UniProtKB/Swiss-Prot annotation:
It catalyses: 3-oxobutanoyl-[ACP] + acetyl-[ACP] + H2O = (3S)-hydroxy-3-methylglutaryl-[ACP] + holo-[ACP] + H(+). Keywords: Antibiotic biosynthesis, Cytoplasm, Transferase. Pathway: Antibiotic biosynthesis; bacillaene biosynthesis. It is found in: Cytoplasm. CDD domains: init_cond_enzymes. This is Polyketide biosynthesis 3-hydroxy-3-methylglutaryl-ACP synthase PksG. Its main location: cytoplasm. It is an enzyme of class 2 (transferase). The gene is pksG. Involved in some intermediate steps for the synthesis of the antibiotic polyketide bacillaene which is involved in secondary metabolism. It catalyzes the aldol condensation between the acetyl group attached to the acyl-carrier-protein AcpK (Ac-AcpK) and a beta-ketothioester polyketide intermediate linked to one of the consecutive thiolation domains of PksL. GO terms for biological process: acetyl-CoA metabolic process; antibiotic biosynthetic process. It comes from the Bacteria. InterPro entries: HMG_CoA_synt_C_dom, HMG_CoA_synth_N, Thiolase-like.
Length: 420
């Protein structure tokens, strides 16, 4: 049987970031409560960044490493996002153009809140496993932006949003799926999926979200349990404690993952409290490192955790990683795969940690300028030209490699420019 899974994976965690402890102090938040979020930094989208630029900048190093023949075998491009820029035209059309991909390629977009990345990934994996086009590859790009602008006439933030703001991130993860899954070989058929209608969080308007944070937590925990129980039915003998050497979770913020892990260890694995913290540090913490520096990037959040797990974990032998994906509304899935020492070595060549280290650190004054909507491009903008010098100094921090930015919108058509 043919293998399928991740041949390469890269993260783009933004051009700029904010220290979230500085934000908490500036907003006069309860720092004890804030520390439970387990967050350090959040990526902040600049006015001339959008889900297209994030997606292209994540995928370009993967594409550049391919030969022309390999690049031409990308026959499926799926973008996964809840930050779409048009009701009809998908992000994939722009991304396809700026990556210079073969025109004999299916391209489209999927949406189901934070589950979208897994939805796209599973479609790609099954395309490869189907062998309808032997040797083909698929490119899956999950790209999302939390860009919540203060409504006109109201500067006050609700308490709920004040604590959600520090974890709201921006970024993209690009995943190349094919028959040579050096980085992460999927366990075929080892999937537990679970979904139902619930009004926990949603985006009824383009630049904000609505919902019930308590209900969202309860739904997340319910799905975490039910997806694994379904996985267990399909994989006899699977054990939450022993089958997986690592666990990667959809990560809105680290504290939520820690709570979910604790609940699963008590309820499903029947582990005593004394052993849970050690297990968390060993199997889960490696996957939180990048998430703590980027924030919640919705459809891409699980893959950010997976990339972090592979980069930061110890893979002296092949090890199995269990993955939990959750998207509000809701749909969820638990699945697994294998990463080898060679896979970790391959994954580390993308230098994700170095990329995160080189981002521009925003001051609170600069962040507030962006947060209050100065120069931000709202959904449905017909014409605009972007000012790359809005915050002096940022563009100098991007000179390491060519990077794509949004230059203008002309009669709704987005035009981008490479800058190095």
């Amino acid at each position: 049987m043919v293998s399928a899974g991740i041949e390469a994976m890269n993260v783009f965690g933004g051009t700029a970031y904010l220290d979230v402890m500085e934000l908490a102090k500036y907003r006069h938040l309860d720092t004890a409560r804030f520390e439970n979020l387990l967050m350090k930094e959040k990526a902040v989208a600049l006015p001339y960044e959008d889900p297209v630029t994030f997606g292209v900048n994540a995928a370009k190093p993967i594409i550049d490493a391919l030969s022309e023949a390999e690049k031409d075998r990308i026959e499926l491009l799926i973008t996964c996002s809840e930050s779409g820029i048009d009701f009809g035209k998908s992000l994939s059309t722009y991304i396809h153009e700026y990556l210079g991909l073969n025109r004999n390629c299916r391209l489209f977009e999927v949406k189901q809140a934070c589950y979208s990345g897994t939805a796209g990934f599973q479609m790609a994996v099954n395309f490869i496993l189907s062998q309808t086009s032997p040797g083909a590859k698929a490119l899956v790009i999950a790209s999302d932006i939390s860009r919540f602008l203060i409504a006109e006439g109201g500067d006050a933030l609700s308490e709920d949003w004040s604590y959600a703001e520090p974890s709201a991130g921006a970024g993209a993860v690009a995943v190349l799926v094919g028959e040579n899954p050096e980085v992460f070989q999927i366990d075929p058929g080892a999937n537990g999926y679970y979904g139902y209608e619930v009004m926990d969080t949603c985006r009824p308007i383009p630049d904000s979200e609505a919902g019930d944070s308590d209900l969202s937590l309860m739904s997340y925990l319910d799905c975490c349990e039910q997806t694994f129980l379904e996985y267990q039915k399909r994989v006899p003998g699977a054990n939450y404690q022993d089958t997986f050497q690592y666990l990667a979770y959809h990560t809105p913020f680290g504290g939520m993952v820690k709570g979910a892990h604790r609940t699963m260890m008590r309820k499903v694995a029947k582990v005593k409290t004394s052993g849970i913290e050690t297990d968390f540090l060993t199997r889960v913490k490696p996957g939180l490192n990048y998430c703590q520096r980027v924030g919640n990037i919705m459809g891409a959040a699980l893959f950010l955790a997976l990339a972090s797990t592979i980069d930061q974990g110890r893979f002296d032998t092949p090890k199995r990683i269990g993955c939990f994906s959750y998207g509000s509304g809701c749909c969820s899935e638990f699945y697994s795969g294998i990463t080898t020492p060679q896979g970790q070595e391959r994954q580390r060549t993308f230098g994700i940690e170095k990329h995160l280290d080189r981002r521009y650190q925003l001051s609170m004054e600069e962040y507030e300028l962006l947060f209050k909507g100065s120069g931000m491009v709202r959904f449905g903008t017909r014409n605009v030209k972007l000012d790359f010098e809005m915050i002096p100094g940022i563009m100098q921090s991007t000179q390491e490699k060519p990077r794509l930015f949004l230059e203008e919108i002309s009669e709704f058509h987005r035009k981008y420019r490479w800058i190095s």
